Amino acid sequence: MRNRRMTKVAVLATSLLISIFTVNATECTVGKAAVMPVAEKHGSAGAFIGKVGDIVLIAGGSDFENAKPWEGGVKSYFDKVWAVTDAGGRLSCREVEDVRLPVPLGNGCAAGDGKTMFCIGGMNADGRSEDIFTLSGSLDDLKVRSFCSLPAGFVPNAAEYHKGYIYIIGSRDGANSLLRLNVGSRQFKELAPCPGTLVTEGSCFVYQHNGREEAFYLIGGRSSGPDGIFMESNVWEYLPTHDTWNRKASFNDGGKPLSLMYGSAVKYGSAHILVFGGDDGVEFLRRDSLGRDESRPEELVEAFLGHKGFSNKIFAYHTITDTWTTLDSLDLSLPVVTTAVELNGKIIIPSGEARPGVRSEDIIEVSIADKASFGWVNYLVVIVYLLLMMGMGFYFSRRNNGSDKFFKGGGSIPWWAAGISIFATALSAITFLSIPAKAYAADWGMFMYNMTIILTVPVVINFYLPLFRKLKVASAYEYLKERFSGSVRWLASAFFCLFMFTRIAIVLFLPSLALNAVTGINIYLCILMMGVVTIIYCTMGGIEAVVWGDVVQGILLVGGAIISFVWIVGGIKGGFDGFMNVAVEQSKFNILNMSLDWTQPVFWVAILGGFSNQLLTYTSDQSVVQKYLTVKDTKGTEKGLWLNGLLSIPIAFLFFGIGTALFVFFRQEPQLLNVGMSNTDSIFPHYIMCRLPVGISGLLIAAIFAAAMSTLSSNINSSTTVMCEDFYTKIRKNCTDAQKVRFARVSGIIVGTLGVLMAIALATFDIASLWDQFNFFLGLLTSSLGGLFLMGIFTKRIGTRSAVTGFVGCVVVLLLFHRFSHVTSTLYGFLGLVSCFLIGWLSSFVFGKGR
């Protein structure tokens, strides 16, 4: 009786434990969505397939129209072109009238940029073709044009388009070969060949990012020669930046290596490659053997007729963890000798070969969804946190009785609170997500970037802080008026306000995008919750609400990070020892990369870039500088800065450790990855949602909200301070103290609302690329702002005109580096500061000394 009762309790406890976990489930929906309009239910295998605009083209290919192979039939080739269209979610396929290929062709390869499809090589009854031609235009005006010819003797296997080039994997003179075709100049360049076994046909060749850099993946294939037919299961990674190949985890099903030929593969999400079906070659080799034995014709016919169809599985390869998983096993077998193409968020697999010698007329549609449920308990946790922040705003609004209190807290903020506030402001939600994501996807190469805060703090304390404290500036840019002129101050202030507006939108949009992808929370709700609550508490309570809000948020996000790290490591096979062993084996703790590759985050890049960017933040960013004056005296500010710097060291270890732990966990459990994850920055919230219990996951999501809101509140408050001190009080010289506070609150609401609206626009319209360019240009100006302070503090020679020349020259130099070099953007802060100072200093010999 007692045992029975204990069993019931155990079952109940297990059920309860399972129920409190939030689970992200990947669902694959596969079906026959349309048929090709061909006679007698025939289709086309080995066609050129690709997307042109909003249609998928199927050009050429082959079939056994008159008799099947076991009946002695001969393969015939097509010159027709068919188009698959999507009208309101319903697929249809029709022949494109009056459009024909130059000659009937099949078994070539296709690649394209979404506007033009390049058809490469192929063969027909007359032999192999070395021609490349294009298909482009609309469905009503589709054009076939000759493009160029392949190098003599080169036989293409597969191709992929990327950034103006077509990479073509193939063979020549009995060896592997890789060519790169420059689409603009139509010139070929021979690249490093794959060092693996010769593969001549049937491979998948797909571009995908590997977490560190761009890469191409060659999967499977086959070749034939005097020794017979060889099937490949190997996977090779090609790195175009270095022109090198790396051997990766072999194609496998449940850990069992499996040969693969003529599967269909597509890039999916930020780091997955999906492989649909394919042939393992077992039955193919049997038929080949029977075909060579003339004494067993009946067995050969039986082998053809008894074939059950090709693989029914969808496989997923994850480029970061180098792991294979079986995503789904379907009720229908998938065709081979075809190409999978993405169309309007779905994957289309047209026609192909259903069984040996038998074409498929079906157009297969695949939809993949990763469903997540946030749950009412998690919502409750987040709502309680948001109400707490609003209450803080109401509390401090009753204590603000003047502009000095609103902008500088009356100098009454404890030094430790100011230090935590500076720390929390610098650790935005983007950082909260991106540091673990960077360590997860790559290694600790950027760790030293965070450590440079220890180099920055002494410079700020000894050279910048005395001036800010002496002038008692509410706006950092008041110093520029004293050192140069009012026009330089207004220039800097205007660009700072514009940059803050863009930063507010980005700080709202990017975390909301990541949270929406993994939690299912509506992206607009995310933006509005963070934006509206932050606007309320920071405009009501002023800098005091901002600082004390940062303290609460800093404690929440650090506490949440500690919980996460402990939980992740606890879920790794082997615990902490297992975590360390895998991380060391995979070189995830690599910090001291001493190479002089300025395109990568090597040691020198991290040190120079980190120090320069930290210096920019702590000397010219109003959202940080403003907090220097919230403390009673200079000594207190110094202690606050040192606290911020010292906090950054263990926190860097913590967040890089979380990223490495995520890598180890998902390398062991790749089936738990979200295949549709569009950005690697979502990996941390994805883990939070799929592995942490309800309530705890809500607390961690609240921590991400906190990281975003601490930055947002400082951005809004600093913008209103600059607008009030640098513009409003200069226009209305006799304004009262109450009018200044009223203006600050109204301008804070306006700036915050504009940022929210811009974030909503980014989430609604396809303007992300345009916005990125705009934000990039404004980002260049931050180097110029830092350069103005550098010129003003470290030399007396530079005057107003020289300072403006340095400001403009810095932007030009950075634009030139961006356009004509591959230098990593991590160095832009260093390049900007140096160029701004040097150009300003040199121009002072033309314009004369400053004051």
Task: Pin down the residues of each PLM region.
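Bacterial N-terminal signal peptides that target proteins for export
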Residues: 1-11
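Composition- and surface-driven signal marking solvent-exposed, interaction-prone regions
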Residues: 4, 23, 288-289, 329, ...
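Bacterial N-terminal signal peptides
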Residues: 10-20
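Short, aromatic- and cysteine-enriched interfacial helices/patches
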Residues: 20, 139, 846-847
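A subset of signal/propeptide-processing and intrinsically disordered low-complexity segments
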Residues: 22, 126, 283-284, 545, ...
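Kelch-like beta-propeller repeat domains
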Residues: 25-374
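Membrane-embedded helix-loop-helix hairpins and adjacent transmembrane boundary segments
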Residues: 371-851
